[in-house]
């Protein structure tokens, strides 16, 4: 039996304006070089832009986008007797949400446009409508998991 104590799970904090954990998760992944106030400004401006364009609550649109981007399966490489297989693995909800946020931010950074809050707001709106590069990334991952279904027993 191990003598080490169990590690307590880290609880995500709430953001100052919306008091929402999801917002804080997104802001922490926008963050670069420790400039958190800039990350908050970018995100809040993109939420304002979403509200102007859709005339809906931006948090609901964000939640829809993240929900539609969250993958159920991912593929991981497994080495079995000299050959490498892409094995489909089910992932936890939180891990899927983190992946969805990462894909959303990557695709919004690649998007052409004036500045980050424009690109992020349009990517969130596209993801909520099941369009955009982030959705394409999710579908690609699911397709790869489906095609490698035969190797699922290696997990």
From Swiss-Prot:
Disulfide bonds listed in the record: none
Keyword line: Chloroplast, Plastid, Ribonucleoprotein, Ribosomal protein, RNA-binding, rRNA-binding
SUPFAM superfamilies: Ribosomal protein S7
GO biological process terms on file: translation
GO cellular component terms listed in the entry, alphabetical order: chloroplast; small ribosomal subunit
Subcellular location: Plastid, Chloroplast
InterPro entries xrefs: Ribosomal_uS7, Ribosomal_uS7_bac/org-type, Ribosomal_uS7_CS, Ribosomal_uS7_dom, Ribosomal_uS7_dom_sf
Segments forming a coiled coil: none
Segment forming the signal sequence: none
GO molecular function, one term: structural constituent of ribosome
Lineage: superkingdom: Eukaryota
Its job: One of the primary rRNA binding proteins, it binds directly to 16S rRNA where it nucleates assembly of the head domain of the 30S subunit.
Subunit structure: Part of the 30S ribosomal subunit.
Family: Belongs to the universal ribosomal protein uS7 family.
Official protein name in the record: Small ribosomal subunit protein uS7c
Gene responsible for this protein: rps7
